[in-house]
């Protein structure tokens, strides 16, 4: 996936439309397959529609497993800004997926709803586990539980690198 750092936003990452790989292309490929299926050009309609439905979930799961901290956000959301600032202030690297900048952001938000039970943003994952929104994340931080979760992930990733 191709991501570009936003200069004024610290470690905030946004989708770069100049890249040819990533969620937009994969989701567009699934949407194209579904359109072909609907027009009769595809012989296996049900599998094409399944691909369309599972593409966002697969991309979300891949992003979550590849990064210790992932924040699914919207650029205009004050709670999202608050959550990103918390991780920035803790000097923790994180990946942000700005749903409102993605062409298929609504499908990703629908997939996040199915995974977490909420449509609101931010949706925050640490060490592969959904921890909640901004309020939940701040509570974990105040209780002293957030940083240990992050460190646990970094330790796990460094051990994997040792054995590769």
Curated annotation (Swiss-Prot):
[2Fe-2S] cluster binds at residues 68, 153. The modification Phosphoserine is found at residue 20. The keyword Transport applies. The modification S-glutathionyl cysteine is found at residue 77. It comes from the Eukaryota. Glutathione binds at residues 74, 109, 121. The 2Fe-2S present in the homodimer leads to inactivation of the enzyme. The 2Fe-2S may serve as a redox sensor: the presence of one-electron oxidants or reductants leading to the loss of the 2Fe-2S cluster, subsequent monomerization and activation of the enzyme. Unlike other glutaredoxins, it is not inhibited by oxidation of structural Cys residues. The absence of GLRX2 dramatically sensitizes cells to cell death induced by doxorubicin/adriamycin and phenylarsine oxide. Glutathione-dependent oxidoreductase that facilitates the maintenance of mitochondrial redox homeostasis upon induction of apoptosis by oxidative stress. Involved in response to hydrogen peroxide and regulation of apoptosis caused by oxidative stress. Acts as a very efficient catalyst of monothiol reactions because of its high affinity for protein glutathione-mixed disulfides. Can receive electrons not only from glutathione (GSH), but also from thioredoxin reductase supporting both monothiol and dithiol reactions. This is Glutaredoxin-2, mitochondrial.
């Amino acid at each position: 996936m191709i991501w570009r750092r936003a200069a004024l936003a610290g470690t905030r990452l946004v989708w770069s439309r100049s890249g040819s790989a990533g969620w937009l292309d994969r989701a567009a490929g699934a949407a194209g397959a579904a359109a072909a299926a609907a027009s009769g050009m595809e012989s296996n309609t049900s599998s094409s529609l399944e691909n369309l439905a599972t593409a966002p979930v697969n991309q979300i799961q891949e992003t979550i497993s590849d990064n210790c901290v992932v924040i699914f956000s919207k650029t205009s959301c004050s709670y999202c800004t608050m959550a990103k600032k918390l991780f920035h202030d803790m000097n923790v690297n994180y990946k942000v997926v700005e749903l409102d900048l993605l062409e298929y952001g609504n499908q990703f938000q629908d997939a996040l709803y199915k995974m977490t039970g909420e449509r609101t943003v931010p949706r925050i994952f640490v060490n592969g586990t959904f921890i909640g929104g901004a309020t939940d994340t701040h509570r974990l931080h105040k209780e002293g539980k957030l940083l240990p979760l992050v460190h646990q992930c970094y330790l796990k990733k460094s051990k994997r690198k040792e054995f590769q």
